[in-house]
Amino acid sequence: AAAKAAGAEYCVLTTRHHDGFALWPSEYGDFSTKNYLDGRDLVGEYVEACRKNGIKVGFYYSPPDWRWNRERMSFSYGDTPPLGIDHESITLPEYTAEEQQRIDDEFNEYVRGQVTELLTRYGKIDIIWFDGRLPQKENTISADEIREYQPGILINPRGLGYGDFRTPECRFPEKTFAPEWWELCFVYSDGAWGYLNHECYKPNGWLLAELSKTRAWDGNFLPNVGPDGNGEMPHTYYQRMAEIADWMKHSGESVKGTKGGIWPERCNVPVTRNDSAWYIHIDWVCDDEITVTDVDKPKQLIYLRTGEEISFEYENRSIIFTFPENSKTILTDVVKVIW
């Protein structure tokens, strides 16, 4: 409910990460809620909560599985000698070609089985978000097969090497992917994708600035939050979501149902647009004079948070103004341009 109030249109749950633990009672493997938590289906509970709040359902799934391969892989980094799961020195086993093929086929069937469960147990699923290459790509499961189970589903490109949308991570791209669909995923807490025993989150001024830039380039923004061992979100998360919800009440129209297209070529700050207005996004650290070039003279500029009119100059087909210092907040301030 907190995410919905803050403007979330879809969520993506980590159904299984690289550690290999599946959050549903899977018939494949021995490391899921079938063997733990008395068979509780956490994925099903998530799906129910999404539908209750009118949020589209996304599943993250990691094809790589460190637990499955723990006796056959190194947990070291870079070019260092092989290390075991406890970072002890190990010698990796060697297999014949036939043995390796058997291992690969078993793992492939395991991944295929789990992905198929996710696609067939929970009704309509809107997004499948693979984090890593499927072990045998189309021979694991193809895009056509996925869509046979889930017509209309969106597939990210990390599993098959191609998909419906790009997924840059933790760094804003140097150039837009538009007209291709894309989504920027980012760590919202300060330090990790998973749960941390502190409540340090990036400020909402940062989050709204990233959202504004992403929407100005026709992308979606997917911030990550890790719950604790009981599935509870940290208190700070709810505070931040409430603050974003308040912002959405006055400025949500600037990021909902809008498109981009003119930043940075014709404006020095992000701009979103719809058929009736343009929206100029001024982030929490911007002190610059704002210039929008190659436009007709507007009727007025309105500060969405307060409704006050913003004075501006118009010359050489350019809008020029400075956002009032006494109106600035620590979030993104949005000025609506009306013609």
Locate the predicted segments by residue:
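Mature catalytic domains of secreted/periplasmic carbohydrate-active enzymes
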Residues: 1-339
